[in-house]
Amino acid sequence: MIMAKMDIRLSADQEKAAEAIISVIEKKANGTLRGEEMLLTMGGFAGTGKTTTLASAVGMVANRPKIAFCAFAGKAASVLKTKLERAGTLALGDYVGTIHGLIYRPRHGGSSGSITESDIDDKAPVERKPITGNTDQKMAFDLVDDIDQSIIVVDEASMVNEQIFADLQSFGYPIIAIGDHGQLPPVIGSFNLMEDPMIRLEKIHRQAEGDPIIHVSRLARETGRIPIGVYGLGVEKIQKTGSLAFAERIGPSTMTLCGMNVTRVWWNNFLRTRYGFKSNDPEIGERIICLKNNREEEIYNGMTGVITSIVAKGQHWYKISATMDAGNLYEGWCYKHQFGSVKTAFNVPGMPQWQVGDLFDWAYAMTVHKSQGSEADDVVVMEERISRTEDEWRRWLYTAVTRAKKKLLIVGS
């Protein structure tokens, strides 16, 4: 099968997957979609051409219904939008963005909107307000009444938890869920939408069979063990020792990944110092990562950017302007004590959720869970086994190494 618009020839497994996607779209358009056809799941490991197959299939259907293309993480949604635009897949009325932006609206008094200077309480106690790390944010959102599209495509579907999937299903529209069934499941609960996908892409397309990153990803996925050694130009694993000499290869554009938040905080502090940032406060030019969605400001969990201006206000806030990697400009009030904290400030005792403001932290290092949906040319992975089961470990390691596009350094044993 050849997708003429994109001049792409699909392989046999991609063609089978494309036909299944086309069937859902066409049956929805002519009203013949049966109940058991309301969900289609397509899985594929790194490099199998999942987005290419999706774009090809959608582009083959004339006069199709409007489609909502969405992903859990803002970064993943941004990457998806870029790929679909490049393929010429999008049509008038389609949606491309986060799941939260598609089906939720901030509840009055919730934590997902913006605060203004008038909301800043200068009389707040001067002591640092503790962060509890309570991650239950569901009370801050309500479901919208309906969406403008009649088909939902979920990318990076391995990140979707059971509650969000149930909310997506509640609209009664067919769902096409696409993801890498080798990656980590959602952080909360045992639900895994990609555990046993209905359709699987098997053949590697994104990079040559001999690509060292693909080889390393297979080792991670199949054995959970990557031996010490050099696997190709810029791709190697070294023994973890007490020396930090390897850190010299970490640059400002390197994605540094780890398993635990305490490790993330340590590396953020170490790299900040190395880059010449001496203050305990964030500074102009620093890389930051968003930790909480704010639709009003078009910032989403996992989105990264660079600070262009920053002013402290009161004891608990910064007024920050930043250029986000997705291309948008951010300006808003951020909770000061989130920077350098091990936990995320979803619940600050003595302060209403809406007054906490936006949540950012330094982005020189991040956990593998937070990196899902992102990719970088250069990646450094700090292996941290902690208490994971064998399957969890394989998924963690596989997810980590598949963030790399060109260079990969693994530090472990």
Residue positions per predicted region:
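N-terminal pre-P-loop "Q-motif" helix
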Residues: 7-29
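Conserved helicase motor core of SF1/SF2 NTP-dependent helicases
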Residues: 41-48, 52-65, 71-87, 97-111, ...
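Core RecA-like ATPase module of SF1/SF2 helicases and allied nucleic-acid translocases
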Residues: 48-52, 74, 89-97, 105, ...
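Short basic/glycine-enriched coil/helix segment immediately N-terminal to the Walker B
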Residues: 34, 112-150, 169-170, 371, ...
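Conserved SAM-binding loop
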Residues: 10, 69, 177, 256
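Conserved adenine-nucleotide phosphate-binding loops and their immediately adjacent elements
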Residues: 1-8, 43
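Helicase P-loop NTPase motor core
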Residues: 223-267
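Pre-Walker A (Motif I) flank of P-loop NTPase domains
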Residues: 30-40
